[in-house]
């Protein structure tokens, strides 16, 4: 039992379950952030950071798109790598613009999401995803 716990060997099934847990957990938690912004859009649009010179409303809309809608795609694992691109950009903005690169301070959560999203971008959605069902091969 101890030998199995300490072993560095992992099989494909373990990796796929880990990817599922990572995808769903990050997706649900981030969708919650996006849902809050979506449901309070009118109050937030005049206070939101204009991070690309597009205006506060457009910046908020892009953030809601990433945090809520792309997170839903991430949860089911559909178009996972495409859905991760806006999420990664959003977290880069959060870490380096909103939190001034303070990864050990207020930007820690955004940096953690960024690390998760980059990991998923590199590895993909895994076997237990809509991508695996629709895009075999």
Q: What are these regions, as identified by a protein language model?
A:
Residues 44-56:
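Perimembrane loop-to-helix junctions flanking transmembrane segments
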Residues 1-39, 57-65, 69-137:
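Extended, low-polarity transmembrane helix blocks
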């Amino acid at each position: 039992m101890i030998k199995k716990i300490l072993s560095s060997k992992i099989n494909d099934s373990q990796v796929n379950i880990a990817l599922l847990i990572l995808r769903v957990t990050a997706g649900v938690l981030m969708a919650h952030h996006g849902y809050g912004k979506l449901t309070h859009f009118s109050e937030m649009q005049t206070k939101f950071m204009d991070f690309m010179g597009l205006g506060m409303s457009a910046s908020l809309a892009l953030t809601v798109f990433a945090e809520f809608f792309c997170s839903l795609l991430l949860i089911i694992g559909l178009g996972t790598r495409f859905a991760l691109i806006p999420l990664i950009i959003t977290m880069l903005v959060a870490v380096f613009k909103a939190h001034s690169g303070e990864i050990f301070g207020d930007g820690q959560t955004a940096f953690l999401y960024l690390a998760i999203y980059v990991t998923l971008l590199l590895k993909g959605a895994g076997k237990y995803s809509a991508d695996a069902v629709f895009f075999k091969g």
